[in-house]
Amino acid sequence: MARGLQGVMLRSFGARDHTATVIETISIAPHFVRVRMVSPTLFQDAEAEPAAWLRFWFPDPNGSNTEFQRAYTISEADPAAGRFAVDVVLHDPAGPASSWARTVKPGATIAVMSLMGSSRFDVPEEQPAGYLLIGDSASIPGMNGIIETVPNDVPIEMYLEQHDDNDTLIPLAKHPRLRVRWVMRRDEKSLAEAIENRDWSDWYAWATPEAAALKCVRVRLRDEFGFPKSEIHAQAYWNAGRAMGTHRATEPAATEPEVGAAPQPESAVPAPARGSWRAQAASRLLAPLKLPLVLSGVLAALVTLAQLAPFVLLVELSRLLVSGAGAHRLFTVGFAAVGLLGTGALLAAALTLWLHVIDARFARALRLRLLSKLSRLPLGWFTSRGSGSIKKLVTDDTLALHYLVTHAVPDAVAAVVAPVGVLVYLFVVDWRVALVLFGPVLVYLTITSSLTIQSGPRIVQAQRWAEKMNGEAGSYLEGQPVIRVFGAASSSFRRRLDEYIGFLVAWQRPLAGKKTLMDLATRPATFLWLIAATGTLLVATHRMDPVNLLPFMFLGTTFGARLLGIAYGLGGLRTGLLAARHLQVTLDETELAVREHPREPLDGEAPATVVFDHVTFGYRPGVPVIQDVSLTLRPGTVTALVGPSGSGKSTLATLLARFHDVERGAIRVGGQDIRSLAADELYTRVGFVLQEAQLVHGTAAENIALAVPDAPAEQVQVAAREAQIHDRVLRLPDGYDTVLGANSGLSGGERQRLTIARAILGDTPVLILDEATAFADPESEYLVQQALNRLTRDRTVLVIAHRLHTITRADQIVVLDHGRIVERGTHEELLAAGGRYCRLWDTGQGSRVAVAAAQDGTR
């Protein structure tokens, strides 16, 4: 087949054809067929990500030598076996792809490549409020991949434009929160007008319909709903009435509305929004700095020009020396150069000092706001994040913001103004030599684009490899005793490391030549060689004065380095803006509000009585984790929450500690709604022991007395005795004065008992124990149970446990399933009922009851 300019360009960017062999074709709908293929080499270049597509070269149905290029989304993939499938809409009249898909037989082959422009859906670290998917039948394969990737608790709104009566027969992926709306096409505005008029704040839009419809959709998303550019993926998959894609010969392409080989990216321009997006958070945080940052950019441009001026004068001084100018003229130019050099340095220092003053004031106010905000956020906000992410927010992001305010804008402006200023000056001196300097720049930009395209699929793989190797390295270090005893060969880390190195070699080795050429293109020696060669030619032919080469020798050789500075300056700017976004998103988090007028306690409710009154709660709107739970906990009793994983046990307990606020209903302690209590007051009534025992850096005594810092040593030791941890503390190197921390040397059960001692000393009337024996060995578990028995005296205790034998003596056992109470009663009552609790017990949850009974006999 003929391969024209398009094929040459693709190959110059590193694209290569792979041969795919058809395995089978399956009719999914009357006009929708799935073609399954296999290619041993395709997935060396391609990455089977959701919504990623491949380029195919289809033969001309008229039998000519032309190949037509079309793009289709990967609907199935098994990279290890080299198998994949694409879905093709069969159009009438049929074009090259439809004709091929209708008639292709198993064993037929076709050329396919993965390079150049394939978009894919990347799951963000921070999920949006929901996904708005907009398209038509050609978009369904890609959207199905997205739907299968989106977590079940994230809503999806899907608008599909119907062009054919059979479009609705195309199967869609399943999702519990997916809502689909088919829109019959009347004109190009039909799809856009069908989008619900609502607040789409923090939603992400993926729009891939026909080109004319996309333009209308884009306008509505931008102008009426206020979607920012970063929250819209807009790409036309086909053009009504015009064939998409290219061909590899001179014959015209047949008209066919199919997915194009080069989908046309549409951009959305930010406009005043009715909604609010996290993507716009950085601009809100930096709004007070807008004028100073703009002014600093203008001043930085002037300072950069002032700093370039001495070099220009130095060049002119050299030209005067060569031409034999007088001493007075030389001294005048020399003193002017020195004066401008000093002036530029002083202006740069003054600008930096001014920006540091602005940054210091802004950073102080920001840190005060951030610390105040953190003190008012619900505890659930902290437990849902690792300490590393919070440290990054408070320390790293604020430092990145310092660079943004004080250095990023001046650096970025200087990186742009300096080469432009140099280039303008050199063009004034001699435009012919200056024009030659663009040669290495074009080479650099072309190679950079090629490397970006070739590395696209590998970048995702590299990120996954990095995450995998981090986990493997941690396991390798933790398993050193076993690895050394049984031999290093028994460790998978070495094999994984070899595979990782092989992946990096396979990725980077083919790019080595281009990277070397890119490095050479920006070196001063390259520019010097070009200047010397071009200048010599012009001087030898009497087209240029030799003295005019001096400016190029002084300034032209640094042109490449100045261009590299643009990337570094803009990189710092992007990092700072991302940090600003993280900080503002935190400042926008919902706080735990305290009602201004606390309600009086209800009559008849004891101070330690806890009431869950028709409580409903969900971590995301519309996805309840706790549903209409009503429950009363009496003083001096133990209430146990049991149920399968994900039933809502820990969530219900944390609601009592007000880690989050309920959506509906109320939780009362002593007759008062906990939302009417300040945090300090609430935690004098409710104490808790978390599933993972938390120790702070301090002595054992300080860890126990965390809630009562002024408690005397005698009270601390009494609490430790009641928690069955006193003897273990005495065995520590310095007893109660031993400094503990993350690596305290205490076992899981011992850490649990230490935190129980902390709760005992706090003497709260209500106590929450989340998985109190989760990390305990049998001996420690027995001691923890003894401590729990002591805690029930005159206290309301809520216990969560998966191991049912630990709560057989609870006064009340509540069985949860999917956030609802399905059973409640004592251990004996629930076993006799033969319901969910009985089934949990029979499946082995109570297998250790004999051990527990034996231990109970010794109490």
Swiss-Prot record:
Q: Which UniProt keywords apply?
A: ATP-binding, Cell inner membrane, Cell membrane, FAD, Flavoprotein, Membrane, Nucleotide-binding, Translocase, Transmembrane, Transmembrane helix, Transport
Show the segment(s) annotated as Disordered.
247-267
Chief subcellular location equals membrane
Cytoplasmic topological domain: 1-292, 356-408, 454-519, 570-859
Q: Which residues form the FAD-binding FR-type domain?
A: 15-122
So what family is this one in?
Belongs to the ABC transporter superfamily. Siderophore-Fe(3+) uptake transporter (SIUT) (TC 3.A.1.21) family.
Supply the name of the protein.
Answer: Mycobactin import ATP-binding/permease protein IrtA
